[in-house]
């Protein structure tokens, strides 16, 4: 009798993470899986035996299509850090997970997520090998941060980049209507890698002069020099629009947002909660230059804008889910699917497999050779990299003028 599969979603959601879920589900069913279970709220929910049978939820082609076009995590998410299984306390957690997976007759385990989720897959695969388990553990990449190693880019990034490029164009239009001195600072997600903030450069084109300054976390930040640059820019044009990463840091390693408020909150993986960078900088500029300012935080909007997804991104998100299932059924375990770019024009991409050890707890940064000399703008090399990822659209299915989503009441 065919073994069952189980799939979970973890970490921050994206606009296309459910397309990867659809890819895993359909690929498993095509390959003869018994039931396909979903973890409700990831591994944390699984430890509480909170699961659903996806076969009972995704009954029609329309259900699958709705799933692909529904943003955020259909199964719910978590930020649970698995302990070290080499300790007595930690091993008890793995023993419980093994017991639950055994009860469900699981042969294939998929986790859709970013760096921390790949850490989870790596630990489970290692423990599985230790106890002689025949379960195949596979990682499916997802993160708007685009900071996963070995993959050319990560599903979720293309749609977030598209959203950022679009809203930056619209913010620039709004910021220039009065002809008076004004500084608009837009805060964009990105703790240690500036891929999302770099996407603000996509706004530039024949119909838009683009943002005036980009501040990446890869470049040490100096508040005084920042204010001086703004002052120089305002001598040339009254309205300035700046894109700044939430994670810009001073030379001593402190986050800029810490200059305004102590950042005490951390998640299970030890990541500080970052917010307030744009607000601090806007207040500083207003005080020192006696000019009007506005701060805008894109916040969760950049990761859940299902009305503005990239068709390329959705297609590839589905593709990596299917590739993970294919690999698991072929006997692979402890690996992640990566996207390998073949060419830019025409844009072509394929998939490959990499050991989790090459991915987990590592970060891919924006290459500084793609940034101009004074670190305030992106060069054509970045545009050539990013533009193919935002191409084409896949609009939501609208009902009475609003996007129609599929959802699980259990989550």
Show the residue positions of the predicted features:
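C-terminal non-catalytic interaction/assembly regions of soluble proteins
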Residues: 257-411
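Glycine-rich oxoanion-binding loops at beta->alpha junctions
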Residues: 49-107, 116, 155, 169
């Amino acid at each position: 009798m065919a073994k069952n599969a189980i799939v979970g979603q973890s970490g921050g959601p994206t606009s296309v993470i459910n397309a990867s879920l659809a890819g895993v589900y359909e690929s498993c069913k095509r390959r003869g899986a018994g039931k396909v279970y979903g973890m409700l709220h990831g591994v944390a929910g699984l430890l509480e035996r909170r699961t659903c049978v996806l076969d009972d939820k995704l009954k029609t082609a329309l259900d699958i299509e709705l799933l692909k076009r529904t943003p955020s995590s259909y199964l719910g998410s978590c930020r649970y850090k698995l302990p070290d299984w080499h300790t007595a306390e930690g091993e008890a957690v793995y023993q419980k997970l093994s017991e639950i997976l055994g009860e469900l007759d699981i042969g294939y385990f998929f986790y859709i997520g970013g760096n921390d989720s790949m850490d989870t897959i790596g630990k489970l695969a290692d423990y599985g090998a230790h106890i002689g388990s025949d379960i195949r553990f596979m990682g499916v990449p997802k993160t708007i941060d685009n900071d996963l190693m070995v993959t050319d880019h990560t599903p979720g990034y293309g749609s977030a980049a598209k959203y950022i490029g679009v809203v930056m164009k619209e913010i620039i239009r709004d910021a220039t209507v009065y002809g008076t001195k004004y500084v608009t600072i837009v805060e964009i997600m990105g703790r240690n890698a500036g891929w999302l903030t770099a996407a603000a450069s996509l706004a530039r084109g024949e119909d838009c002069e683009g943002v005036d300054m980009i501040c990446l976390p890869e470049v040490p930040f100096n508040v005084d020099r920042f204010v001086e640059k703004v002052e120089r820019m305002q001598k040339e044009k009254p309205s300035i629009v700046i894109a700044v990463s939430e994670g810009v840091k001073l030379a001593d390693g402190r986050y800029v947002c810490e200059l305004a408020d102590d950042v005490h909150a951390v998640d299970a993986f030890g990541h500080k909660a970052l917010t307030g960078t744009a607000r601090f900088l806007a207040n500083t500029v207003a005080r020192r230059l006696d000019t009007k300012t506005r701060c805008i935080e894109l916040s969760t909007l950049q990761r859940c804008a299902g009305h503005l997804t990239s068709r390329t991104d959705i297609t590839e998100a589905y593709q990596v889910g299917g590739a993970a299932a294919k690999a698991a059924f072929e006997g692979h375990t402890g690996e992640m699917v990566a996207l390998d770019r073949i060419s830019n024009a025409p844009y072509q991409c394929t998939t490959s497999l990499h050991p989790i050890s090459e991915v987990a707890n590592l970060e891919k940064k924006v290459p500084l050779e793609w940034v101009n000399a004074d670190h305030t703008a992106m060069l054509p090399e970045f545009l050539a990299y990013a533009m193919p990822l935002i191409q084409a659209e896949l609009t939501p299915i609208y009902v009475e003028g609003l996007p129609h989503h599929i959802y699980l009441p259990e989550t």
